[in-house]
């Protein structure tokens, strides 16, 4: 069976988007530490209509990113790796290990400290960077390994979304939350009545986002719950869910995530930056992402296979699973996003961002080198195009 063109496009976009994301991060760091650094940071902190520009990026544009994540998850549930329960078990169990172990490592260092709210930071995986790094290895990578990493990262992001909704939502306003639930219920009814026109769902999503913004539950959650009421149908190219997913890939990869990186990596690296890396928070983040992620993913997979709960695909080797588990430690955008919700102190946020970037680069290099050693021979075109 041929791999769908959309899946190929997805991998290609993630690879190119990862490069753009890296460039945006480097540019942001360079400008922030230049002579115009304070003006640059001031731009993102400028108030427009009662909120900062950074706030609009994090609560507005990132909702579109989460909508795409939700649509990806919907596709996996209805027609992808998560559509078959036994096939879905391996990435689900892997993702659980990749969330629980890093969070426990951070908690070990920070329980009882002002940093304990940051335990959700090392739980996340940046799907754009992780898949982008894997794609650098070209046709040496078995398709099942790419699919495993994609499913793992999507489930990981879902776990991060639940973490945000449960632990980082403040001062719940029941009336606004009920309003958002009411809008969602109307959209669900439209879905069940086979209303296959996109604009009612997008319009309802905007209203729902407004209610969520004022409810105390983080507004970006709107993107995910909206995705699951947009009709998927049979998953054919005419499905409005598939069409929207296709339309969103390039804007998210090449506009929204780079803008997020520009807004949230404008960090002034002063003489005390190395001291911030010695804090228990930074140590917890670094060890959580670089050690906890691969340990948790690999350990949980090994236990599940040993118990006979699930099995790894025939064309995968354990050494390759370990390499992908290392790439799971690339937290970057998702980890930074949770950092902004976990802390209010600017110094702590800046220190966390530096730790996240250092951890993500380390995890990427380890994963890339590990896979380069374990993936020896390029696969033929026929093998890379067939499942």
UniProtKB/Swiss-Prot annotation:
Q: Name one GO biological process term.
A: regulation of pH
List the GO terms this entry assigns under cellular component, sorted alphabetically. Answer: plasma membrane
Reaction it catalyzes:
Na(+)(in) + 2 H(+)(out) = Na(+)(out) + 2 H(+)(in)
Membrane topology note? Multi-pass membrane protein
Query: Gene3D superfamilies from the xrefs?
Result: Na+/H+ antiporter like domain
Which residues span the membrane? 16-36, 53-73, 89-109, 118-138, 147-167, 171-191, 197-217, 220-240, 251-271, 283-303, 321-341, 354-374
Q: Which GO terms describe its molecular function?
A: sodium:proton antiporter activity
Q: Keyword set for this entry?
A: Antiport, Cell inner membrane, Cell membrane, Ion transport, Membrane, Sodium, Sodium transport, Transmembrane, Transmembrane helix, Transport
Where in or outside the cell? Cell inner membrane
* Family listed: Belongs to the NhaA Na(+)/H(+) (TC 2.A.33) antiporter family.
What the protein does comes down to: Na(+)/H(+) antiporter that extrudes sodium in exchange for external protons.
Protein name as it appears in the record = Na(+)/H(+) antiporter NhaA
Species of origin reads Cytophaga hutchinsonii (strain ATCC 33406 / DSM 1761 / CIP 103989 / NBRC 15051 / NCIMB 9469 / D465)
Q: Which gene encodes it?
A: nhaA
């Amino acid at each position: 069976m041929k791999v769908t063109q959309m899946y190929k496009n997805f991998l290609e976009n993630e690879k190119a988007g990862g490069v753009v994301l890296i460039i945006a991060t480097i540019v942001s760091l360079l400008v922030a530490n230049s002579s115009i650094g304070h003006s640059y940071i001031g731009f993102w902190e400028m108030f427009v209509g009662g909120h900062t520009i950074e706030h609009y990026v994090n609560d507005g544009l990132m909702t579109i990113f989460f909508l795409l994540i939700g649509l990806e998850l919907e596709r996996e549930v209805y027609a992808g790796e998560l559509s078959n329960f036994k096939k879905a078990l391996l990435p689900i169990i892997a993702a659980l290990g990749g969330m629980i172990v890093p969070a426990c490592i951070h908690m070990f260092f920070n329980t009882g400290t002002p940093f304990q709210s940051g335990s959700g930071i090392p739980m996340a995986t940046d799907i754009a960077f992780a898949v982008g790094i894997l794609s650098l290895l070209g046709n040496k990578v078995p398709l099942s390994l790419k699919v495993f990493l994609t499913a793992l990262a999507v489930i990981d992001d879902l776990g991060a979304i639940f973490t945000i909704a449960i632990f980082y939502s403040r001062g719940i306003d029941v009336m606004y939350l009920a309003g958002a639930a009411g809008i969602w219920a109307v959209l669900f009814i439209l879905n069940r009545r086979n209303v296959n026109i996109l604009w009612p769902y997008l319009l309802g999503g905007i209203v729902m986002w407004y209610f969520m913004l004022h409810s105390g539950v983080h507004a970006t959650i709107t993107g995910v719950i909206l995705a699951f009421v947009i009709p998927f149908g049979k998953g054919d190219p005419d499905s409005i869910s598939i069409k929207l997913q296709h339309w969103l890939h390039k804007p998210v990869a090449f506009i929204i995530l780079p803008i997020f990186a520009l807004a949230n990596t404008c960090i002034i690296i002063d003489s005390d930056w190395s001291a911030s890396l010695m804090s228990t928070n930074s140590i917890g983040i670094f060890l959580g992402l670089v050690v906890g992620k691969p340990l948790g993913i690999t350990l949980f997979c090994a236990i599940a296979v040993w118990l006979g709960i699930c099995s790894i695909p025939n064309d995968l080797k354990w050494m390759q699973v370990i390499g992908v588990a290392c790439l799971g430690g690339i937290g970057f955008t998702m980890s930074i996003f949770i950092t902004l919700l976990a802390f209010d102190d600017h110094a702590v946020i800046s220190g966390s961002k530096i730790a996240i970037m250092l951890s993500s680069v380390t995890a990427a290099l380890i994963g890339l080198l590990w896979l380069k050693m374990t993936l020896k021979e390029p696969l033929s075109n026929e093998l890379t195009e067939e499942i």
